[in-house]
C-alpha cells in the first residue's frame, strides 16, 4: 500500500470523525434545551416482557429515575452523522445502505421513545417488543433486498475457511444479522456510558478493517459514527445527563449489522461485539428459564444488571465491560488479518 495514499486516507477519515464530533457537540445544547423544557423524561420499566414485576431492577435504579433524566438524545448523533455523510462521504455503493439502516432503525426507536415519554404502553413503557421486532425485520428485509439486488452481494467470508456462495439466501442471513445486532445493542443500553463505549469500540474496529480493505468510504462512515458517539459519551458517562434512547440504540445496532455485511466480516461480529452477544444471550436465557423451569439463572438480566445486583458499582461494570470490549476488538481485528478478510 502506498504510504502517502494511506496517509491521505487516514486524514480524510480523521476529518470526518472530528466533524461529526464537533457538529454533535454544537447540536447538543439545542437538544438539551428542548429535552428539559418539554420533559423528555425516560419512564422506568416496572414489568418484564413476561409481565412479572422487576423488583431487583427497580431497586437498583430508583435513584436514577428520581433525577428525571431525559432520553432520545441519540437523535443528535443521527442528525450529525446524516449531515456529515451526505455532505462529505456520500456513496451509493458504500454509505447509502448503512445510513439508511441508521435512519430506519432510528425511526423505529424514535416511535418507541415518544410513546415512552408520553407514558403509554404496558410494562416496558413503549412499543410492544413483538411490534418493534416486526418493524426492524421489515426494515432489514428492505435493506437486504438492496444489498443483494442492487449492490450484488451474494457470499460471505468464513474465517480460515473461505468464501461461502449463498445467492439469494444472503438476504435471510442479512436480516438475521441486522435484527440480532439491533436488538442486542438495544438490550445493552442499560448503564451510563455502557452502550456508547462498546459501540465506539466496535465501530472503530470495523472502521480499521474497512480501511485495510480499501473501503475508504465505509471506514469514513464508521469513524463518523465514532465521532458522534464520543460527543454523546461526553455527557452520558456517569452520572449521565441524558440517555440515547431507543432512537440511538436501534439506529446504531441496525447500522452495525449492515457494516458487518458490507465488510464481509459477519462471522467476526460476534467476536468484536461479544458483549452485545452476552447481554442479549443472558436476557434470552433468563426468559426461557423462567418460562420453562420457573426459576431465574441471573439475579437480574441482562447480565450487566446481574453484576450490579451482586454488588459491583455501576461504573465498575461499565469500565470492565469496556476493557473486555477492547480485548474482543483486538482479537476480532487479528482474526480479520489472519482469516482472509483483508
Please annotate each region the language model reported.
Residues 2-277, 342:
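"…together with the soluble PPM/PP2C metallo-phosphatase catalytic core" -> "…together
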Residues 7-8, 12, 16, 308, ...:
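Peripheral (non-transmembrane) domains and long loops of multi-pass membrane proteins
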Residues 31-34, 114, 288, 299, ...:
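Hydrophobic alpha-helical segments of integral membrane proteins
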Residues 40-48, 280-300:
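Juxtamembrane non-transmembrane "cap" segments at the membrane-aqueous interface
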Residues 66-76, 310-321:
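Loop-to-transmembrane boundary segments
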Residues 151, 331-342:
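Juxtamembrane boundary at the C-terminal end of a transmembrane helix
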Residues 190-198, 295-318:
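Solvent-exposed interhelical
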Residues 316-336:
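Final/C-terminal transmembrane alpha-helix of multipass membrane proteins
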